[in-house]
């Protein structure tokens, strides 16, 4: 017996009953999240009298666009529209809390124009999704916190000027998170401070350092590591001007700020500050845009400026603030292709008697390219991708289609001897461990990043940006295959 399928009827949507229109400023100009790229202009809607008090600039509303309902943000209220006879009414104000200020709405328009995108593509990165339970919470009052510890640093007086637009070159061999935290504490006395960090690990370290100066109530985080509820709650605090210090990742660069606030961008050349989704804005460039168009101070922080920042320094648009320091640097070149030059062994052994030694290597993995040991031809897969080896006992496999090659033989000379080029951190660990036996080895790269290292002598091997924190400092830092740090691979080989 065939079981009959349940009857499904088409939904019938009737025209909603029109409500009386507001007498004062009856038209609202709204950005609508249409999802259509070329429909990026504001649209006019009637404001019902019952929603007139809630329909203000920056309010989140629901409107009918075409035959479906869409979210929108109110830009302004006006008394007329070119299409007065064909306007639809706003359906509802979805949140009693404002999600944008006139300043941020202007910023959304500037960014959309500069990067040739839709304003709502920018808004998706700037404004978190609504949480109804948070909207019902009462606003909490937070007083301005005072510095708990006196500042122990003496930076350039330029850094504490009321008006500033500069690049601060950090001194080497100094914890950057500590320096940035001290800078935040110094600027905190002059007004609101927004810190943009390249990644969550950096953000956590700055928050930890700031805890020595300020109470946690003064610090608000805006990043994807928070829960959906906490992020929306913190965002509303920022919109209400209840946050004195804001910490966030690239999306926080759109946070509403008070007049005269300071934006601090860490690692301004980092790829993490680029938004991968359309329209592809960059947090550093958005901060530069805010500084040029609005009353906002800007400090870019890093060890050396990027080409873009260097150009602004050359044109004197940015002030370059240098840091005087002296670091003992020794450059040594291998003579026979060895990993560590023989002349460096004595320096490293001497440093291991004092504390941990850090080896910075350019790549993760084991052998990132397989070559024939006899003819030195590159081993390729049938799909055209190069072969890699992920361990000493593993067979080569393709980096693109993951096809394994057990019993690999060179297609040119039929030799089965493998030469591993482009050594990764795992291969470095093997060779360094043999060179300096009886010392513990700590690897830090990729998904396995060590937060800190012990104070005892040990070998720490890390890729750039993954180096663990040493509370006593590293006795020596060795950059292996230094030229590789400046090479960017743009192709499959």
Label every model-predicted segment:
Residues 353-434:
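Cys/His-rich short segments
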Residues 200-203, 211, 419-452, 463-464, ...:
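P-loop/Walker A nucleotide phosphate-binding surfaces of NTP-dependent enzymes
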Residues 214-226, 383, 388-390, 437-447:
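Conserved RecA-like helicase motor-core motifs
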Residues 1-335, 350-353, 358, 476-480, ...:
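Accessory, non-ATPase domains that flank or precede helicase/AAA+ motor cores in DNA-metabolism machines
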Residues 236-257, 445, 452-469:
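Conserved two-lobed SF2 helicase motor
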Residues 347:
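N-terminal cationic and glycine-rich segments that engage phosphates or anionic surfaces
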Residues 489-493:
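Conserved phosphate-handling catalytic cores of large alpha/beta enzymes
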């Amino acid at each position: 017996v065939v079981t009959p399928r349940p009857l499904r009827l088409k939904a019938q949507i009737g025209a909603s009953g029109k409500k009386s229109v507001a007498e004062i400023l009856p038209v609202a100009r709204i950005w609508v999240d249409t999802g259509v790229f070329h429909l990026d202009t504001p649209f006019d809607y009637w404001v019902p009298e019952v929603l007139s008090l809630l329909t203000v600039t920056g309010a989140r509303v629901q409107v009918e666009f075409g035959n479906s309902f869409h979210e929108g943000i109110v830009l302004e209220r006006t008394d007329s529209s070119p299409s007065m006879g064909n306007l639809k009414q706003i359906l509802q104000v979805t949140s009693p809390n404002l999600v944008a200020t006139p300043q941020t709405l202007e910023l959304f328009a500037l960014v959309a124009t500069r990067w040739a995108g839709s304003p709502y593509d920018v808004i998706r990165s700037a404004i978190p999704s609504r949480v109804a339970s948070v909207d019902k919470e009462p606003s909490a009052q937070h007083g301005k916190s005072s510095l708990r510890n006196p500042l122990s640093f003496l930076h350039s007086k330029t850094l504490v000027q009321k008006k500033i637009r500069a690049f601060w070159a950090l001194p080497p061999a100094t914890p950057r998170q500590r320096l940035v935290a001290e800078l935040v504490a110094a600027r905190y006395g002059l007004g609101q401070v927004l810190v943009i960090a390249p990644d969550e690990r950096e953000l956590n370290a700055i928050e930890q350092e700031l805890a020595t100066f300020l109470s946690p109530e003064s610090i608000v985080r805006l990043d994807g590591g928070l829960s959906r509820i906490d992020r929306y709650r913190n965002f509303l605090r920022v919109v209400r001007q209840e946050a004195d210090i804001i910490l966030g990742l690239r999306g926080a660069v759109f946070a509403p700020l008070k007049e005269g606030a300071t934006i601090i961008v860490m690692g301004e050349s980092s790829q993490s500050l680029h938004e991968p989704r359309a329209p592809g804005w960059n947090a550093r460039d958005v901060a530069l845009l805010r500084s040029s168009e609005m009353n906002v101070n800007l400090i870019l922080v890093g060890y050396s400026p990027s080409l873009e920042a260097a150009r602004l320094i050359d044109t004197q648009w940015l002030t370059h603030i240098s840091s005087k320091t002296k670091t003992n640097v020794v450059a040594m070149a291998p003579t026979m292709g060895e990993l560590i030059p023989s002349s460096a062994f004595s320096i490293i052994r001497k440093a291991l008697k004092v504390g941990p030694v850090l080896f910075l290597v350019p790549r993760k993995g084991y052998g990132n390219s397989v070559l024939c040991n006899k003819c030195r031809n590159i081993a390729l897969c049938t799909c055209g991708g190069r072969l890699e080896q992920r361990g000493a006992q593993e067979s080569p496999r393709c980096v693109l289609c993951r096809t394994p090659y057990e019993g690999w033989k060179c297609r040119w000379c039929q030799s089965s001897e493998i030469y591993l080029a482009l050594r990764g951190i795992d291969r470095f660990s093997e060779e360094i461990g043999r060179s300096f036996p009886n010392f513990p080895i700590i690897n830090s790269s990729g998904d396995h990043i060590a937060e800190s290292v012990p104070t005892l002598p040990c070998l720490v091997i890390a890729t750039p940006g993954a180096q663990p924190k040493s509370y006593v400092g590293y006795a020596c830092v060795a950059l292996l295959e230094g030229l590789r740090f400046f090479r960017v691979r743009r192709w499959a080989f």
